[in-house]
Regions:
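A short, N-terminal "cap"/entry segment at the start of jelly-roll beta-barrel domains
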Residues: 2-12, 16-45, 78, 93-94, ...
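Envelope-exposed proteins and targeting segments
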Residues: 45-47, 73, 114
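Short acidic-glycine-tyrosine-enriched beta hairpin
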Residues: 36-41, 51, 81-98
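Ligand-binding loop in jelly-roll beta-barrel domains
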Residues: 84, 99-125
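Histidine-centered metal-chelating micro-motifs
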Residues: 56-58, 76, 93, 97-106
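N-terminal targeting signals for Sec/Tat export/insertion, comprising classic cleavable signal peptides
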Residues: 34-65
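Glycine- and acidic-residue-biased ligand/ion/polar-headgroup-sensing regions
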Residues: 62-81, 91
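Extracellular/periplasmic catalytic domains that process cell-envelope and extracellular macromolecules
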Residues: 41, 61, 69, 86, ...
């Protein structure tokens, strides 16, 4: 085998290994939780989500009303059956209790992104439920 041919195979092998590395995942920090006395069985949660560069979410739903406010960077959000939207710091997004969140990712592969989510949900329900497509 010639050296250029070996080099090509080595490059291909390296690319295949990189493709097998999973994307970065989001970091979630709970900031606040409270029972909503005026709404029996409901609670409010406030979480901060940090996307490292290149991070993306799994397809999921919240079974909650979710109000998103972007603090830093740019993110792409898409609900099933709707177009994707790109949001930057200061912009907002809403997910309803029956929405399936098919895309949630950091636009940048070099800069982090952060956002706050206010969730109004049934008490004891998980904050996030993965959905199989």
């Amino acid at each position: 085998m010639t050296k250029p041919h070996l080099y090509s195979r080595a490059c291909l092998a390296a690319l295949l290994m990189l493709a097998a590395v999973p994307a970065e995942t989001a970091e979630v920090k709970e900031l606040f939780a409270i029972d909503l006395a005026d709404y029996p069985g409901k609670e409010g949660r406030v979480i901060e989500v940090s996307y490292p560069p290149g991070a993306q979410d799994v397809v999921h739903r919240h079974d909650a009303d979710a109000f998103v406010y972007v603090l830093e960077g740019q993110i792409v959000m898409q609900l099933k059956g709707q177009p994707a939207v790109t949001l930057k710091a200061g912009q907002t997004f809403y997910e309803g209790p029956t929405d399936v969140h098919v895309v949630g990712r950091n636009v940048s592969n070099t800069e982090p992104a952060r956002f706050v989510v206010v969730l109004l949900k049934s008490k004891g329900a998980p904050v996030l439920t993965p959905v199989k497509e």
